[in-house]
């Protein structure tokens, strides 16, 4: 279903659906319930532990987890075991019974992730060394520079001149709401701006849009000044990216109204009601450099389309492949298109009128040990500066006996 994920058991019988995402579904030993991790925001693993019966009655067993990965039923089916943390990255093993009584079962330095539980009670788990970092380059540079800050840095956007990057720090030191920071690509230390998840730079570079816990939209000054709150206008949850129109007075973002799937909106920073510019289920909203179009992705088809900001029928983007990431160049007739990869990514310059594609750049890190993928590939409008994120995971597998 557009804009929603569904949990089915058996196949075709819908038990639960959400505008967020579902992970680690496990059927109970009796086959009468499904336990799963329920994440309210796409690509963020914070969330709750839930169970749903075959009639579709869902219950939350444990909530408030900043990161949750891995879940399994106990052999008797009286508890759900999972790995999670309330802050940072170092997950522990917890057990919760069907009445919501929670207990900690196991922890280890560096954190662990539950993989499975055997019928005799033995646990299969991994001890993980995880890191999310940022690499980038500027005009004239002979090699890429590591622009990471702490242990979980995610690039979000580049300044209009391509010299600065705004990013999130989401790891152990990022805090419960994460931290928004900026950094000069040429080597200056990071400068924290405040709590939240970052959006883009304003056209004059003086502000960065951000959200706090996905529910409050704020503007953070990049220099002296105080932050500003923007009225939600009925938006229950914000998605990313959050970008500016060229006039510097309006923001473009994906958001969810009560009971609705995510869609793209435009809103004046002085407040007022957000205006929907795409149907539900269409997100990843990128304004064109002339402010006339919103490029966005249909979650059902994974296909990018162009939506006129002033209304009218959307149009296809010839040459853009389903699932490809895209961003605008400084010329509204062209886009950069790329597909995330594990160890390398090819970036194409795409003529959105003719569909002609030309290889523009290939990104390949020098150290591919433990790489899980490259993501968040961001280019300046002129294509001369770029940054990208990488995730590295090194794991040791353990069999644990004797836990109760």
What are these regions (language model features)?
Residues 3-8, 44-50, 88-94, 131-136, ...:
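Structural motif
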Residues 1, 15-39, 44, 58-83, ...:
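Conserved beta-propeller blade repeats
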Residues 39-42, 85-87, 128, 139, ...:
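Short polar/acidic secondary-structure junctions
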Residues 123-125, 132-145, 165:
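An edge-strand/N-cap motif at the start of beta-rich repeat modules
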Residues 1-17, 353-362:
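Short, solvent-exposed linear motifs at loop/edge-of-secondary-structure regions
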Residues 344-393:
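C-terminal closing repeat unit and adjoining cap/tail of repeat-based domains
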Residues 9-12, 53-57, 97-101, 138-142, ...:
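Short loop/turn segments that connect beta-strands within beta-propeller blades
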């Amino acid at each position: 279903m557009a804009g929603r994920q569904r949990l089915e058991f058996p196949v075709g019988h819908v038990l639960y659906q959400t505008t967020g995402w579902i992970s680690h579904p496990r059927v109970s030993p009796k086959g009468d319930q499904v336990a799963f991790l329920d994440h309210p925001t796409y690509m963020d693993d914070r969330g709750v532990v839930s169970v749903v019966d075959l009639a579709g009655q869902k219950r939350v067993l444990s909530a408030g987890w900043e990161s949750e990965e891995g879940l399994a039923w106990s052999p008797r089916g009286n508890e759900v075991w999972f790995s999670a943390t309330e802050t940072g990255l170092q997950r522990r093993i917890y057990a919760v019974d069907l009445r919501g009584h929670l207990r900690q079962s196991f922890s280890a330095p560096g954190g662990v992730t539950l993989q499975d539980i055997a019928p005799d009670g033995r646990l299969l788990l991994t001890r993980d060394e995880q890191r999310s970092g940022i690499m980038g380059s500027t005009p004239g540079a002979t090699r890429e520079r590591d622009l990471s800050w702490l242990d979980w840095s995610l690039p979000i956007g580049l300044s209009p001149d391509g010299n600065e990057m705004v990013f999130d720090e989401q790891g152990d030191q990022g805090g419960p709401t994460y931290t928004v920071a900026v950094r000069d690509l040429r080597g200056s230390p990071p400068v924290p701006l405040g709590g939240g998840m970052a959006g883009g730079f304003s056209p004059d570079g003086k502000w960065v849009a951000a959200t706090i816990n996905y529910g409050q939209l704020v503007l953070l000054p990049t220099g002296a000044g105080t932050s500003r709150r923007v009225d939600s206008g009925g938006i229950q949850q914000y998605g990313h990216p959050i970008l500016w129109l060229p006039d510097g007075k309006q923001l473009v973002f994906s958001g969810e109204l009560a009971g609705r799937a995510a869609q793209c909106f435009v809103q004046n920073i002085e407040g007022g009601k957000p205006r929907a510019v795409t149907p539900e289920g269409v997100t990843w909203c990128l304004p064109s450099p002339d402010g006339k179009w919103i490029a966005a992705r249909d979650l059902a088809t994974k296909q990018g389309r162009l939506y006129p900001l002033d209304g009218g029928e959307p149009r296809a983007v010839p040459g853009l492949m389903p699932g490809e990431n895209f961003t605008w160049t400084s010329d509204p007739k062209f886009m950069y298109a790329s597909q995330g990869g594990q160890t390398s990514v090819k970036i194409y310059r795409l003529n959105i009128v003719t569909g002609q594609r030309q290889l523009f750049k290939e990104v390949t890190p020098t150290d591919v040990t433990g790489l899980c993928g490259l993501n968040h590939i961001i280019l300046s409008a002129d294509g001369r500066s770029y940054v990208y994120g990488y995730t590295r995971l090194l794991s040791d597998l353990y069999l644990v006996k004797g836990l109760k």
